[in-house]
Amino acid sequence: MVRVAAIDCGSNSTRLLISNVENGRLENLLKQHEVTKLSENLIKTNKIGDDSKKRFYKVLRKYLKIIDNNNVEEVLCIGTAALRNSRNSDEIIDDVKSKFKLDLKIISGEEEGYLTGIGVQSSFEDLENYLIVDIGGQSTELIYDIDKRVNVDSKEIGVVMMNENYLNQNPISVLQEDNAFQFFDKMFN
């Protein structure tokens, strides 16, 4: 048996999962979720801002204490859309390595969807002909199985991005709503 930790550095939140792995099966021991807003203002600046980095690093510090207290043997740290799309992701990867001794790996949208699919499939026996929709802050992954062939389609559309670009007034104007629907239709048709 091996005790592992996965840190999912998403566009809006950073998650921690600690599990025991034995014979290819997971026994989940602990799950944590913290809002870090890595993608805050990413659309405007094309980079992850200082406030976002501070929140993110604070959460990583907290998670590493939890990992140490749980005798974890292996840690996997994954970055998704915000880190894929930011101009300063290399700087953040270097910071995470030097400050926390973690190798932050940025994965593609397709890899993200594939890993999501594996996670969902592990919760069900004989899952066939399904559709999984993973809506993130900056991207949405569609994972679907047709006749035992798994397919992944990653779209650059997420809740934070839609909020910042199209739905940023309260109440939402008719024009904003129309623009949001047009963008949504363009992405999925």
Identify the meaning behind each predicted range.
Residues 1-9, 17-132, 143-189:
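Nucleotide/phosphate-binding catalytic cleft detector across ATP-hydrolyzing
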Residues 12-14, 138:
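Conserved Rossmann-like nucleotide-cofactor binding loop
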